[in-house]
């Protein structure tokens, strides 16, 4: 996963304008709770359930080329690197299927098959849609700009990194290591 491969698939990212200001990769704000209509690989999970852990979120769509070439393999890679921390309950990986296009194709049944084929074993939530809204609720709350988009949340529940599209994986890995080393404290 080197920056040299970025040019090969940057045009493949799925983009949507949500009318929110662009987020920087280092913006610090409280992570909003997600709104999930259905879970795969989990009986149900809230952000509050993960308090005290570093949380890595992949906002994706099953038909997104950038997700299939970058964020999904990166999640697998990080799960291997941080396997012991995951077993120790210090880090959690979550994917959120944020469908803002191709609704008739990206149905839950197809997603369940996709998750199995891609060997995704961590919790996968299907972002809930509000009546009459094109964009799903969690996508709006996190102000994501498309897919793939990844977020890293610290132990206190603050977004410490959020990036649309490609980014240097080593940067994310270093941040995860830093956050794992931080003491769990009160609200910041």
Locations of the language-model features?
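Thiol/disulfide oxidoreductase modules built on the thioredoxin-like
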Residues: 118-120, 126-175
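Structural microenvironment flanking redox-active thiols in thiol-disulfide oxidoreductases
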Residues: 68-118, 129-138
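N-terminal "domain-start" segment that seeds a small globular fold
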Residues: 21-48
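Bacterial N-terminal signal peptides
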Residues: 7-17
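Alpha/beta-hydrolase fold active-site loops
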Residues: 54-55, 91, 148
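Short, solvent-exposed mixed-charge patches
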Residues: 181, 185-188
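Short active-site neighborhood of thiol/selenol oxidoreductases, capturing the structured segment around
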Residues: 45-68
């Amino acid at each position: 996963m080197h920056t040299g491969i970025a040019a090969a698939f940057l045009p493949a990212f799925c983009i949507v304008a949500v009318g929110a200001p662009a987020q920087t990769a280092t913006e610090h704000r409280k992570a909003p709770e997600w709104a999930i209509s259905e879970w795969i690989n989990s009986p149900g999970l809230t952000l509050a359930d993960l308090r005290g852990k570093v949380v890595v979120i992949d906002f994706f769509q099953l038909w997104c080329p950038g997700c299939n070439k970058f964020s999904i393999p990166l999640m697998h890679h990080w799960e291997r690197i941080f396997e012991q921390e995951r077993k120790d309950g210090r880090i959690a990986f979550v994917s959120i299927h944020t469908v803002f296009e191709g609704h008739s194709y990206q149905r839950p049944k197809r997603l369940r098959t996709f998750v199995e084929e891609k060997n995704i074993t961590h919790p996968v939530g299907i972002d809930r849609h509000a009546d009459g809204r094109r964009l799903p609720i969690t996508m709006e709350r996190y102000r994501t700009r498309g897919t793939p988009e990844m977020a890293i949340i610290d132990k206190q529940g603050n977004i410490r990194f959020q990036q649309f599209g490609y980014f240097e994986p080593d940067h994310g890995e270093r941040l995860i290591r830093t956050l794992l080393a931080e003491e769990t404290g009160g609200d910041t």
